[in-house]
Amino acid sequence: MFSLLLLTSTALVETALGVSPSYNGLGLTPQMGWNNWNTFACNVTEQLLLGTADRISELGLKDVGYNYVILDDCWSGGRSSNGSLVPDLNKFPHGMKYVADHLHDQDLLFGMYSSAGEYTCAGYPGSLGHEEKDAQFFARNEVDYLKYDNCYNKGQFGTPQASYERYKAMSDALNNTGRPIFYSLCNWGQDLTFYWGSAIANSWRMSGDITADFDRPDSRCPCGDDEYDCKYAGYHCSIMNILNKAAPMGQNANPGGWNDLDMLEVGVGNLTDDEEKAHFSMWAMVRSPLIIGADVNHLKPSSFSIYAQSPVIAINQDPRGVPATRVWRRQVSDTDAYGRGEVQFWSGPLENGDQVIAFLNGGNRMRPMNAGLDDIFFDSHPGAPELNSTWAVYDLWANRMEDSVASDILNGNRSSNGLLYNSTQQSYSQGLARNDSRLFGSQIGTIQAGGRLNVTVPAHGVGLYRLRLQ
């Protein structure tokens, strides 16, 4: 345990000195991309990966920032006679280097999957005990990202040290290849990953698997909202369940290492538009990776416009990299069909002195919500200048793309693509530094010194705002 504390302390010292704590120089902002699992599970093929990559480029999503195309489980054909991983040639007839080349030709990055166990979660060969050989396989095929799961781990868990050592073996092996490979742990938050993840990885899952439900309880996700040290993470965890578990963990994330709340369910299942906006907004607020889980070939216009909302993405990609904090949480009487209902207020600092705030309405009706500057700057002492200043308030969803424009883009109208923010020409960091109006939403008013912001938030919805000093 001492070694873990030392590693954590080292990361904190590096942060204090202004040195990136990223163990491999990657992940200075949360990763963005696409993963097949939420929609396609094991139904993966070369055609799916290449077609998705083409579609991401055609729609302008690559330029918005979604640059990783990640192949999940079920790609493997086993191991060769010398123990090397081989792809299933029925699914990937040209091999993995062919896929990587196609993606790289489009300036996209290629992600693959394995598990820190004897088998992957779907029963294919895992990498436990094969870390060096498998890392060489990934590097040889020019993989840029590894999602590393937790199934069939032979009982090598139960303490932070046990899990740390098991995942460190692949971290070391990836580094030994000499190829920069983003390392994404998927150990479901087991053994307090948020304490030690940043020493060996760029992101780490902090809960059981997500499902496309806003706040539905499920016995397969047995740990409650506040059980951040969950002994049995399970799966089918709702959006609110995961968000509430993540609330205390923001203090352990920073550039180079992020809490991963799992893939986005925008465009998956039957979430309402307000639920999809709330889901996307809160993942951005807590600096979770933004990984599309939907079929990009069959996105509805409203979901596409959420994925393309650059003022919200700019919060997620803010170079300061400080996750927002949940300031308060209150239960409400207007519960849904599952007896669930709560409201929350979140706030966090941004690189340029701005502040981002979110009013989250988990209740079953539209409601007024409000917060004062003492809520927004909850750590400030009485008399602090931020409490005695005037702040301009910008609604980060006010300039959302119209469905008609989104439909034009989805139907191949390239001229409409020019309406999307292009982070390949100007990064979010550069755009924020240059006060690019496309990243700030629309001003809706001001908060005077000592004043309050009053908003109306739909059921299962969010009000998301950026505050700028007047």
Swiss-Prot record:
GO BP annotations, alphabetical order: melibiose catabolic process
Disulphide bridges, residue numbers: C42-C74, C121-C151, C221-C237, C223-C230
Keyword Signal in record: yes
Known catalytic reactions: Hydrolysis of terminal, non-reducing alpha-D-galactose residues in alpha-D-galactosides, including galactose oligosaccharides, galactomannans and galactolipids
Signal peptide location: 1-18
InterPro entries registered for this protein in UniProt: Aldolase_TIM (IPR013785), Glyco_hydro_27 (IPR002241), Glyco_hydro_27/36_CS (IPR000111), Glyco_hydro_b (IPR013780), Glyco_hydro_melibiase (IPR006215), Glycoside_hydrolase_SF (IPR017853), Melibiase_C (IPR041233)
Compartments in which it is found: Secreted
Active site: D149 (nucleophile), D209 (proton donor)
Protein name (record): Alpha-galactosidase
Species this protein is from: Zygotorulaspora mrakii (Zygosaccharomyces mrakii)
Lineage of producing organism: Eukaryota, Fungi, Dikarya, Ascomycota, Saccharomycotina
Gene: MEL
